[in-house]
Regions:
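Active-site beta-strand termini and strand-to-loop segments that position acidic
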Residues: 10-14, 76, 114
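Conserved structural core of kinase catalytic domains
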Residues: 22, 36-91
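Short, exposed beta-strand/loop patches in secreted or surface proteins that constitute
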Residues: 7-10, 62-65, 111
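Protein kinase-like catalytic core scaffold
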Residues: 16, 72, 120-122
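Short, surface-exposed beta-strand-loop junctions and turns on beta-sheet-rich folds
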Residues: 24-27, 80, 127-129
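ATP-binding glycine-rich loop module of kinase domains
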Residues: 2-47
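N-terminal non-globular leader segments, chiefly Sec-dependent signal peptides
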Residues: 30-41, 57-61, 139-151
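C-lobe/activation-segment region of protein kinase-like
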Residues: 84-108, 112-151
Length: 151
């Protein structure tokens, strides 16, 4: 499976895939994204907070580990049933609040229904960071002074 910023490579283990990030050859542009180590860090953080103890019963984030310059390992998920964010808006609002407390602005992610009924949140390449003045800055440098959450 290939996207604009990288591709997913199946491994011999059916529960593990490799997320390979396209190498950046030009300066940051509107489509620039975080590199593999930062994507893995964001995904690992999100995986650690999307727990039953934190109030999540449907939303979860697949594990990510072993970041390298242009790739990292990730738990396999099914991507054949996209989910509209409105279907799990309560848990997404909780996720946004926890992310904001860490200085993270979630955006441009994807949601997929899993065979067990849970919803996997993936795609951390365009997450922005909150700045002290209440604006957010994206990986390609754009700053929004009044960011709006989709919920």
């Amino acid at each position: 499976m290939q996207g604009a910023c990288g591709k997913i490579i199946l491994t011999a283990d059916p529960g593990i895939v490799i997320k390979k990030i396209h190498r950046r050859r030009r300066p940051h542009t509107r489509t620039s994204s975080h590199r593999a180590p930062e994507q893995c860090r964001l995904q690992s953080w999100a995986h650690s907070i999307c727990t039953k103890e934190n109030g999540f019963s449907t939303l979860y984030v697949p594990r990510a580990w072993d970041p390298q310059a242009h790739q990292y390992n990730m738990e396999f998920i099914h991507t054949d049933k996209p989910v509209d964010h409105k279907e799990i808006s309560v848990e997404l609002q909780l996720f946004y609040n926890l992310a904001k407390a860490e200085g993270i602005f979630p955006c441009d992610y994807e949601l997929y229904r899993q065979p067990n009924g849970s919803v996997a949140l993936i795609d951390f390449d365009k997450f922005a960071i909150w700045r002290e003045d209440g604006s957010v800055q994206f990986p390609w440098g754009l700053v929004l002074s009044d960011p709006q959450l989709p919920i």
